[in-house]
């Protein structure tokens, strides 16, 4: 099982240089979880870059090409996300700098006791377990 952050999805869908590593990690997972907040963020980024039709590619990747479980943002995650922001939030921790969507991914990983697949250095400055 793994939780996937928006950054990893965007790397794959935008065919960034490290896309293959993220795609391989997703293919190897027996269960894929993503916060509804992170789906929303990914959709916004893709739409801003490629127009409204980019949402179709996102849904196809999540639900046809892969079997992602889109997890609603609930009270337990909200509490964990707020605690994460208090420790690692943008403007609080100069190394982690987590934003709202990052905190949602962090919270889902913590509440599900699962590693997180992400791109970049923000999560490496936290206590979250990384997938790769």
Language-model region placement:
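Active-site neighborhoods of divalent-metal-dependent phosphate/nucleic-acid chemistry enzymes
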Residues: 69-115
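Acidic, PIN/NYN-like endoribonuclease modules and their adjacent C-terminal/linker elements
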Residues: 106-132
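Glycine/charged-rich beta-loop-alpha catalytic/anionic-binding loops adjacent to active sites
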Residues: 23-24, 60-63, 86-92
């Amino acid at each position: 099982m793994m939780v996937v952050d928006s950054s990893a999805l965007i790397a794959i869908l935008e065919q960034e240089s490290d896309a293959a590593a993220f795609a391989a990690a997703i293919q190897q997972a027996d269960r894929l979880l993503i916060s509804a907040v992170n789906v929303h963020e990914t959709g916004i980024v893709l739409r801003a870059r490629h127009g409204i039709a980019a949402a179709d590619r996102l849904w196809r990747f999540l639900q046809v090409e892969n079997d992602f479980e889109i997890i609603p943002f609930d009270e337990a995650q909200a509490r964990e996300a707020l605690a994460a922001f208090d420790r690692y939030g943008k403007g609080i921790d100069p190394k982690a700098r987590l934003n709202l969507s990052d905190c949602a991914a962090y919270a889902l990983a913590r509440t599900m006791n699962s590693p997180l697949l992400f791109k970049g250095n923000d999560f490496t400055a936290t206590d979250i377990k990384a997938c790769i």
